[in-house]
A protein has these predicted regions:
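Mature N-terminal segment immediately following signal peptide/propeptide cleavage
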Residues: 1-10
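Substrate-binding/active-site clefts of carbohydrate-active enzymes
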Residues: 9-56, 62-201
Length: 201
């Protein structure tokens, strides 16, 4: 099993790197926190490479659409902030290109594992925009969009120093993803753990 992050693997179609139809217009291979342009076509072009490695299955980080605004500093290149669970992110390709990749992978004896994340989504997803109640999600209040105001940040401090772990995480029966998330931000990792291990891998 070979796990890969499509945005970081290979750019097979530079024309889909920045699209007018998407809110985030940032793509810069020199910026670690921005999109780099890898896509499904880049993976398809390298299927023989995986055969040469002896790989029998590919596990991608999510490739579903993330139409979130970009700030030029960071992006959800990793795929874990879905805004549309029915469509491949056009910066990765199309649903048809995804099907073509799967078909060609199967012809070469490769299986495809799709990473599906239904325990959270992007802030621009309709589930967040139209919540039936304020506590619909198990989410620290400071992460909710209505709390991302200068007044609120002044009140509680910033992530990069003034805020403490107790301000960021509350006691709950749910497992909060930043604690055990291998794709967590540097700030989250510094506030929680130094590594990540899953015995089933």
């Amino acid at each position: 099993l070979y796990m890969l992050m499509p945005d970081r693997f290979a750019n097979g179609n530079p024309k889909n790197d920045v699209l007018k139809t998407m809110r985030d217009k940032n793509c810069d291979r020199h910026a670690p926190s921005l999109r780099h342009g890898g896509d499904l076509e880049g993976i398809r072009q390298h299927l023989d490479y995986f055969n040469q490695l002896g790989v029998t299955a590919l596990w991608f980080t999510p490739v579903l659409e993330i139409d979130s605004p970009g700030d030029g500093k960071s992006s959800s290149y990793h795929g874990y902030a879905t805004t549309n669970y029915y469509k491949v992110d056009p910066r990765f390709g199309t649903n048809a290109e995804y099907k073509r990749l799967i078909d060609e992978a199967h012809q070469k004896g490769l299986k495809i594992v799709m990473d599906m994340i239904f325990n959270h989504c992007g802030f621009e997803h309709p589930w967040i925009a139209d919540m039936p109640s304020k506590d619909w999600f198990n989410c620290p209040e400071w992460l909710l969009p209505e709390y991302q105001t200068p007044e609120h940040v002044k009140k509680i401090g910033t992530v990069d120093g003034a805020r403490t772990v107790n301000d960021m995480y509350r006691q709950t029966s749910y497992k909060l993803t930043p604690v055990l998330d291998p794709y967590a931000s540097k700030v989250d990792m510094e506030e929680t753990v130094d590594g990540w291990f899953v015995p089933s891998m």
